[in-house]
């Protein structure tokens, strides 16, 4: 089955992944590609539509991102957003100008609803502006289809060539008609069907993995988290017993997690599973290491070394499966965005790794991964399991990792998760966990002065981990969690709750 494809061309804007999500919400498959992608590569991909993202540059900047002018003559509908709008105008000999007054935030916009882009919309609505330049003269063959008080060309079109540009950001919630506008572009301009689904994605991945692997042997990096679990099941459905799952118990797991993973995948799914007890090995490598990036790199490298050793025991292994998902790739940086933190499945891989990679989920957001898991028949409880980073509790114990600190964090986290479940909040909160911030403080217990650890509780709401907000957990639940931890976990005398959104913070503390 050939899927309809929309390309999102990345010019370094902060909302690029949100654009991709908006497209996929319409059951249309899209890929984000760098602006340096050649015309030949674009032709080979044969997209049904192209979207230019925003970006921080001016079209007149010395190193401003460009595209080949030929792209506009391919007969493929193009939608330019913000910088993408200005670039289209500049490339086609329109004029872009810096205004006296910058336009930023919620703005009233006048729409020409005779345009396919604004079909069935109000003549005046609210949009979100964030720009310093604007189009002062549209290219030949274009007409203005939207204006604001400060922007004489808030949108333009060449309906004959199916070229559209908008100065505002339709992908954000503050543009009240944005989702409808993108839907109009996809279905009225690009004439797409919207038939991409998680079931079709799974079918295509299974077929592709069969073809890629052939009769070769595959090893899977299984952590028991949602991502690696879904990846393992997809590959298992494709090649069966050619797959061996290696579960590295590095001593950085949550309470009782190792036994649960072994029971589910060995007994329930009938997979070839090897459990490697490597706690001492990992803690030895992490001894004296406090820097979070070094911890991630060390753990990533040691994981691969363990896999290589297990692979040699198994014989001729050609491929390694990883549960890398799209936000992992984004957070590890691209050519047009800054690196936020190295992901263990990306930045931590040694350059001399001996396996070819299979990453069946690298194009999916977390909610899409869960949907694939449901399609594959993975138990609901496992599919909705809490996200857990590959480095495990090593990045929830701030500073040097020791057995004592791990034990404290593990017990506190188990209590937090247990009380969240009792309160019926498991599926209402995206992610929740306890971490040890490496802070000690004075307290009083049993009429005696104490100087013990602080536990930080973190809980966030999100749909894809790209952005998140802190969860409004009822006070009575937080109160019970706090009282239980200080009473049941030794060396803890203070509990704090993290009320920071992402951005500016990341979900994990390290």
Swiss-Prot record:
It catalyses: XMP + L-glutamine + ATP + H2O = GMP + L-glutamate + AMP + diphosphate + 2 H(+). InterPro entries: Class_I_gatase-like, GATASE, GMP_synth_C, GMP_synth_GATase, GMP_synthase, GMPS_ATP_PPase_dom, NAD/GMP_synthase, Rossmann-like_a/b/a_fold. The keyword Nucleotide-binding applies. Its EC number is 6.3.5.2. The keyword Nucleotide-binding applies. NCBIfam families: guaA_Cterm, guaA_Nterm, PRK00074.1. Homodimer. This is GMP synthase [glutamine-hydrolyzing]. The gene is guaA.
């Amino acid at each position: 089955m050939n899927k309809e494809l929309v390309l999102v061309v990345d010019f370094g804007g902060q909302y690029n992944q949100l654009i991709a999500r908006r497209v996929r919400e319409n059951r249309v498959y899209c890929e984000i590609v760098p602006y340096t992608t050649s015309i030949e590569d674009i032709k080979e991909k044969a997209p049904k539509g192209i979207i230019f993202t925003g970006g921080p540059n001016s079209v007149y900047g010395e190193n401003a991102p460009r595209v080949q002018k030929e792209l506009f003559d391919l007969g493929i509908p193009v939608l330019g957003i913000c910088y993408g709008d200005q670039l289209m105008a500049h490339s086609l000999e329109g004029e872009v100008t810096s205004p006296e007054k910058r336009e930023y935030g919620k703005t009233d916009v006048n729409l020409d609803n005779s345009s396919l882009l604004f079909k069935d919309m109000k003549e005046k609505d609210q949009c979100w502006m964030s720009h310093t330049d604007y189009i002062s003269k549209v290219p030949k063959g274009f007409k203005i289809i939207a204006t604001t008080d400060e922007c004489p060309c808030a949108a333009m079109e060449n309906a004959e060539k199916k070229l559209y540009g908008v100065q505002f950001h339709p992908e954000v919630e503050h543009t009240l008609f944005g989702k409808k506008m993108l839907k109009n572009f996809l279905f009225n301009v690009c004439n797409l069907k919207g038939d991409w689904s998680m079931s079709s994605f799974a079918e295509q991945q299974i077929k592709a993995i069969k073809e890629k692997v052939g009769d070769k042997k595959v090893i899977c990096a299984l952590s028991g988290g949602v991502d690696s679990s879904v990846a393992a099941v997809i590959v298992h459905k494709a090649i069966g017993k050619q797959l061996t799952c290696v579960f590295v118990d590095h001593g950085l797991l949550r309470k009782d997690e190792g036994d649960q993973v072994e029971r589910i995948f060995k007994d329930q799914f009938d997979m070839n599973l090897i459990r490697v007890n490597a706690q001492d090995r990992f803690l030895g490598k992490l001894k004296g290491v406090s820097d979070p990036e070094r911890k991630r790199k060390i753990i990533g490298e040691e994981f691969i070394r363990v896999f290589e050793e297990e692979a040699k025991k198994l014989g001729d292994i050609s491929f390694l499966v990883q549960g890398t998902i799209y936000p992992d790739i984004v957070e590890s940086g691209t050519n047009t965005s800054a690196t936020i933190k190295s992901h263990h499945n990306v930045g931590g891989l040694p350059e001399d790794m001996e396996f070819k990679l299979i990453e069946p989920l690298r194009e999916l957001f977390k909610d899409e991964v869960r949907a694939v898991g449901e399609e594959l028949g993975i138990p609901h409880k496992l599919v909705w399991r809490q996200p857990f980073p590959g480095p495990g509790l090593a990045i929830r114990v701030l500073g040097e990792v020791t057995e004592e600190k791990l034990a404290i964090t593990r017990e506190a986290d188990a209590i937090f998760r247990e009380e969240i479940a009792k309160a019926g909040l498991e599926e209402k909160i995206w992610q929740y966990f306890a971490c040890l911030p490496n802070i000690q403080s004075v307290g009083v217990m049993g009429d005696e002065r104490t100087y013990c650890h602080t536990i930080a509780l973190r809980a966030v709401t999100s749909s894809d981990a790209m952005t998140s907000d802190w969860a409004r957990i009822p006070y009575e639940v937080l109160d019970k969690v706090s009282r239980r931890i200080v009473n049941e976990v030794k060396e803890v005398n203070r509990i704090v709750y993290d009320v920071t959104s992402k951005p500016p913070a990341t979900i994990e503390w390290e």
